Structure formats: C-alpha cells, structure tokens
Design a protein with these regions (language model features):
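SF2 helicase motor core recognition
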Residues: 238-251, 272-274
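Conserved segment of the helicase C-terminal RecA-like domain
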Residues: 274-297
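Helicase motor interdomain insertion/brace
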Residues: 3-15, 33-192, 196-197
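Conserved helicase ATPase core of P-loop NTP-dependent helicases/translocases
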Residues: 209-239
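C-terminal helicase lobe
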Residues: 289-361
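Conserved small/polar residues in nucleotide/adenosyl-binding loops
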Residues: 363-369
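Conserved RecA-like helicase motor-core motifs
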Residues: 5, 199-215
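Conserved RecA-like helicase motor core of SF1/SF2 enzymes
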Residues: 248-269
Length: 369
C-alpha cells in the first residue's frame, strides 16, 4: 500500500528546506476625493438596477455583481426571443450597467488613470462601431471624464508599490521584484511610475493577445524579457497572469500582488515566485470595502477548503491499493532546482545521508485536526 503525506511549511521534516516567506496584507482606504468621484456613478448604477428589478430582469438583492449582470442579460435575451418588447430596453440598460460596473471596479481597485484609459478605449471602440457611445454619453460618465482630465492619480496603491519597491532595492541592490496585476493598463502605468525612481529598472511582461492599440508580446519577446530579468538588466518585472505558470520566471526577492485573485491556485502560484532558495516577502494590496476585499476572502476560503479536502483524502486513503510501483520507477523522475536537474534516486540518497536517522525513521506525518 502507498501513503499520501500532507505537509505544511512548519512540518519538522521540511525544516531543512524551509525558507522564510513573509506575507504582508495592506488594506488601503480610498481617499475622499476618489469616493466623491464614484458617488454619482454609484447613484446612477443603483437607479438602473432598481428599474431592472421592478421589471423582473434583475434579482432583488443588496449587492449586484458580475454574475447578476450576466443573468440579467440572459433574461433580457429570453424576453426578446419571446417578443416581449421590454427585453430591448432591458438589454440596452444591462449593457450600460456592465460597463459602469467595470468602470467603478477599476476606479476602486486600480486607480483613476486606469479608469481613464478604459474610457478612452471605449471611445475608440465607439468610433469603430462598438455600442459604447451610449454609456459615454451618460451625464455621470461625461462629468467624470471632465474631472479626470484635471486630476493626477488618486489611488493609494501605486505610491505604496513605489515605496515597497524602492525600499527593497535600496536594501538589496542586486534584488529582483515581481509585480502581478490583472490589467495591462495597470502594467503600463506601474512601469512608467517605477522608472521615475533611480534604482528601478522596470519593464512589462504580458500575454500574446492584442486588443485594439494594445499589442501583446510574442513568445520570443517573452523569453527575451525573462532573460533580461534573470541577468539583472531589469530588476522589476510587472506581469499579468501570464507570469503565474508555464514559463520559467526567475525567483524574486519581493512579490507584490496589486490586487487579490479569486483563485486559490493562482494565489499560491504567485506567492511561489519568491522564497525558493532564500528569504522573500509577498505584499498583497487590498482596497477596503471593494471587490478586492471580497476576492481576498474567497481565495482564503478556497485555500482552506483545499487543505481540508487533502486531509480528508489522506485519512480516507483514497489511493489505489492494487497499484504496484516498479522499484526502478524513480529513474523516470528528476528533482529540478534553479541551477540543475538531479536524478530522484541520487537526490533521495543524498538527503537520507544529510538528515541521518531522522529521515529514515520519519514514516508518517501528524495530520492537523
């Protein structure tokens, strides 16, 4: 029979490999000026939601999220198919609501400059025939665009990132920093901001796809960028989700998550970009009472559930007892480090010698209750 052992970072058997990883969560309050800019958008959003609720297209609930908007769009489409003329008006309102919802989330979690980029792109799409002009013509949106033209960035995340990065690189001039964000507009603006600081050499790392005037990176460009980061030509890489997996992204001394991600797996992958062979830190940025906070809680719950399921799996021993491993099976595996690939057999023999009796006698791990 074969055992599946579940290890946490503080397990004694892992102490020889333990590398210090400090995780810091920063909960940031939105400034009053930004909250005031959001208020008219929120009021209009709530009015439209109330209208759709009265018409039966939107669920009656306090918080309306992306899924509720998608279901309302489906409800409007069904009404149109059934020749209910109200469906046409509902579909138009829902389309505007979707864009307003995105706009408000961008202002709350990314900042005013990213929101402005979203509106400018909507204007470009409107000229190409996309149905964005109606949303842009809304008085609340028009007034917001006028206000944004006269304002510098208001969101506290960007200056905090600049402070974290410069502190890290001043303390470790040879250090590397990896910043993750969901939005390419945020990538662009963070690179611009960080490069105004003398110790920082920042650049972008994004996916292949192109969207309008925003061009993606080819695989050749991605690999070249990673090599620049690895060699120290650049010391800060600002990446979208493409940097989470699949590519050999070098380890970083500091990882900054510009916003939480709803997937526990993705959060673990991002954290795993630091503290591989030496100490590192992770900083998670959360705008208080926004989508950030809900997403962060959801990700934490997912991670807790993953651990509980693994504990259950171990306890139930849901492994194929009849499966027999060939004694030479280890020859098919290797242990990959940052510098070399070691045959699994050789690695295990070396570790048994290094740990001595503890490695031989350690046959079962105590599971958490």
């Amino acid at each position: 029979a074969h055992n599946l052992d579940l290890c946490k970072r503080n397990e004694p058997l892992l102490s020889a490999y333990d590398v210090d990883m400090k995780i810091h969560t920063h909960v940031l309050d939105l400034p009053d000026t930004l909250t005031a800019l959001l208020a008219p958008l929120r009021a209009h959003f709530d009015e439209e939601v109330a209208h759709l609720q009265r018409q039966g297209f939107m669920p009656t609930k306090e918080y309306i999220g992306t899924n509720d908007i998608e279901r309302a769009q489906q409800s409007a489409s069904r009404a149109i198919q059934q020749r209910d003329m109200r469906g046409y008006d509902a579909a138009r309102r829902v389309a505007d609501l979707r864009r307003l919802h995105i706009l408000m989330n961008l202002m709350q979690t990314q900042g005013t400059s990213v929101a402005q980029a979203f509106l400018n792109r909507a204007e470009e799409e409107g000229r190409r025939g996309r149905k964005t002009n109606r949303m842009l013509a809304l008085p609340v949106v028009h007034q917001l665009r006028l206000a944004l033209n006269d304002l510098d960035e208001l969101h506290p995340k960007a200056p905090l990132v600049a402070s974290l990065v410069t502190q890290e690189l001043n303390a470790k001039p040879e250090g590397k920093v990896l910043i993750f964000t969901e939005y390419r507009d945020s990538v662009e603006r963070l690179v611009q901001l960080l490069n105004t600081h003398g110790s920082v050499k920042a650049d972008a790392f994004i996916g292949h796809s192109s969207r309008g005037s925003q061009k993606g990176m080819t695989q050749k460009q991605q690999l070249a960028q990673l090599n620049r980061f690895r060699s120290g030509e650049i010391n800060v890489l600002v990446a979208t989700s493409v940097g989470e997996e699949g590519l050999d992204v070098p380890a970083a001394d500091l990882v900054v998550l510009y916003e939480p991600v709803p997937s526990a797996v993705r959060a673990i992958q991002r954290r795993g970009r630091t503290a591989r062979q030496r100490a590192g830190s992770v900083h998670v940025l959360i705008a208080r009472n926004t989508r950030d906070a809900y997403v962060h809680k959801a990700s934490e719950r997912q991670e807790e559930n993953m651990h509980r399921l693994m504990v259950k799996l171990v306890r139930q021993k849901q492994l194929n007892e009849a499966y027999v491993v060939d004694e030479d099976a280890l020859e098919s595996f290797a242990v990959q480090t940052d510098t070399e690939s070691v045959e699994a057999k050789v690695f295990l023999e070396a570790e048994i010698l290094r740990h001595g009796p503890a490695a031989v006698s350690y046959t079962h791990l105590t599971l958490p209750t």
